[in-house]
Regions:
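Structure-specific nucleic-acid interaction/processing domains
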Residues: 4, 8-206
Length: 206
């Protein structure tokens, strides 16, 4: 199953957009939720974030290989390693790993938990990569970013059971516009990952 047309366009380009270029839709989203005067469905507290679960068997310590790869190649590997896109607050992202520990004794578990378990089974020092991005935002803003990234990657490439939900003006965007924004977010997330380096969480570190 191919990725979205918007991601394929980036994969086939010679270089990615400069970090200096502002994304208009991202700025619109930021401005819309920055000083909201009405009570939002998920609350107005800026305590949410987005997160990605990545498979280290795909990234292969990507940040240590950036001198041998183009940024476009890095994006292809990064996107190929993502198996779950989420939104939450507190320890929501870490809770998936705890759930996987509990799923060891069950006969059946979700695709997401099974992939976490498969990563841990690979070898003793292999762990899940948990990347937090776009932090300190309200719930509806985080939900919209989640939906955009899922749209760009495509549900068949993920263990997410459903597509996300957009709020505000983004709820009226075309699918193409949403996917284009999601591709921008994935580039931003990849750049964070390359700067921070790869940190894996093993089953004994839960």
């Amino acid at each position: 199953m191919p990725y979205s047309q918007e991601l394929h366009h980036l994969f086939n380009s010679k270089r990615l957009p400069s970090i200096r270029i502002r994304n208009k839709d991202d700025q619109t989203l930021r401005d819309e939720f920055a000083h909201c005067s009405v009570e939002l469905k998920g609350g107005n507290t800026k305590d949410c974030f987005n997160y990605l679960l990545l498979d280290p068997r795909v990234t292969k310590n990507l940040s240590s290989r950036i001198n041998q790869l183009s940024e476009v190649d890095c994006l292809m590997i990064f996107c190929g390693a993502i198996f779950y896109v989420g939104k939450g607050k507190g320890t929501r992202d870490f809770d998936h790993l705890k759930d996987a520990i509990g799923a060891r004794t069950q006969n059946e578990c979700s695709d997401k938990l099974q992939q976490i378990l498969d990563i841990w089974k690979k070898r003793k020092d292999c762990g899940v990569i948990l990347l937090r991005v776009f932090q300190n935002v309200v719930s509806e803003e985080a939900c919209t970013r989640e939906a955009a990234m899922i749209a760009a990657l495509g549900v068949p490439h993920l263990t997410n059971c459903k597509r996300g939900t957009c709020y505000g003006s983004a709820s009226k965007w075309t699918e193409s516009r949403l996917r284009h924004y999601g591709a921008f977010l994935l580039i931003s997330a990849m750049r964070v990952h390359l700067i921070e380096g790869e940190r894996q969480i093993g089953s004994k570190e839960i």
